Amino acid sequence: MIRIPVALPMDSYDICIDEGGLERLGEYLAELGKVNRALVVSNPVVLRHYGARVVRSLNAAGFETASVTVPAGERHKHLRSVERIYQAALEHRLERSSLIVALGGGVVGDMAGFAASTWLRGIRVAQVPTTLLAMVDAAIGGKTGVNHPLGKNLIGTFHQPCLVLIDPQVLGTLPPRETRAAMAEVIKYGVIWDGDLFKRLEQLPSLQRPDARTLTTLLVRSCQAKAEVVVRDEREGGLRAILNYGHTVGHALESATGYRRYLHGEGVALGMAAAGRVAVALDLWSPEELRRQEALIIKARLPVRWKSDIASEALLLRMQSDKKVEAGKVRFVLPEAIGRVHTGVEVPTEVLRRVLDTLRG
């Protein structure tokens, strides 16, 4: 078992990477002190695969346990789905000493975390991610939220989990497309924070389906990178903004296509391709390092262009609703070197439009 501490002033917790850890979830949570009830939030597919194992572990540790499902997919990440969690919390009589277990990918984690942060003005949540993307990103750091018709994650809170439990064994059932999409976030950490990780990715023969040992190594490096950033800036007052690299254009693409065309990681890959080109256009980044980034994205069989039916003007409009807009201006995270980025960069609209146009088709 590998334990990565997230040492925050008020809400410290551990990221535990444990083969077969689902069987021991109840033991991990029992260590946290008095908890009387647990509500497992999942989607129907994940609950069918892993729900019985998780509930059995929780019951064995003395929890009164119930479960509720929310629809799978980003397009269902809205307040109506969260209301299902509230209803289950009411029926199961969750108290302030109770907790919610988020069992699933990033959509489940975001909604379960949001529900936990608002139920009785805040109860504990344990993040148990079952996708690689959620393991390396969404489950860590305490961001929760749901979408609004005009933009992604516009409604949300900061609510740190009491535990992040990662069981790599569950990745054996993950579809190949999901694994590839998660690699976008791993590549992101290499660009924004860990140049050695970027070089390691370049050296690997394949990023499409890494072997178990390589995957665990990438998991650990990515979790460490995210934890290091969050510890330095829990509430995104400055440094943590680097984690938004690729997300401004990525979120706009996801939203503009109704969350049906691109997985989140695919959107991030496209967003990084766009941000990298913007950085080169502004003379902030070298064309050679842009080429290296795009080579890694392609190596993971991720897209670097989108279909021509997505109008640049539609993306520009979506970006105006981005939660990172300040004083009416869209702010970008742009690379300056592998392992280092600028934050809060205001990009001239004509430069951004030109880059978006070059990536269509």
Swiss-Prot record:
Compartment(s): Cytoplasm
Keywords noted in UniProt: Amino-acid biosynthesis, Aromatic amino acid biosynthesis, Cobalt, Cytoplasm, Lyase, Metal-binding, NAD, Nucleotide-binding, Zinc
Reactions it catalyzes: 7-phospho-2-dehydro-3-deoxy-D-arabino-heptonate = 3-dehydroquinate + phosphate
Gene Ontology MF term list: 3-dehydroquinate synthase activity; metal ion binding; nucleotide binding
UniProt: NAD(+) binding residues: 106-110, 130-131, 143, 152
Pathway(s) per entry: Metabolic intermediate biosynthesis; chorismate biosynthesis; chorismate from D-erythrose 4-phosphate and phosphoenolpyruvate: step 2/7
Cofactor note: Binds 1 divalent metal cation per subunit. Can use either Co(2+) or Zn(2+).
GO biological process: amino acid biosynthetic process; aromatic amino acid family biosynthetic process; chorismate biosynthetic process
Binding positions (Zn(2+)): 185, 247, 264
Cofactor names: NAD(+); Co(2+); Zn(2+)
Domain of life: Bacteria
EC number per UniProt: 4.2.3.4
Pfam families in alphabetical order: DHQ_synthase (PF01761), DHQS_C (PF24621)
Main location: cytoplasm
GO CC annotation terms, alphabetical: cytoplasm
Role summary: Catalyzes the conversion of 3-deoxy-D-arabino-heptulosonate 7-phosphate (DAHP) to dehydroquinate (DHQ).
Protein family (similarity comment): Belongs to the sugar phosphate cyclases superfamily. Dehydroquinate synthase family.
Protein name, entry field: 3-dehydroquinate synthase
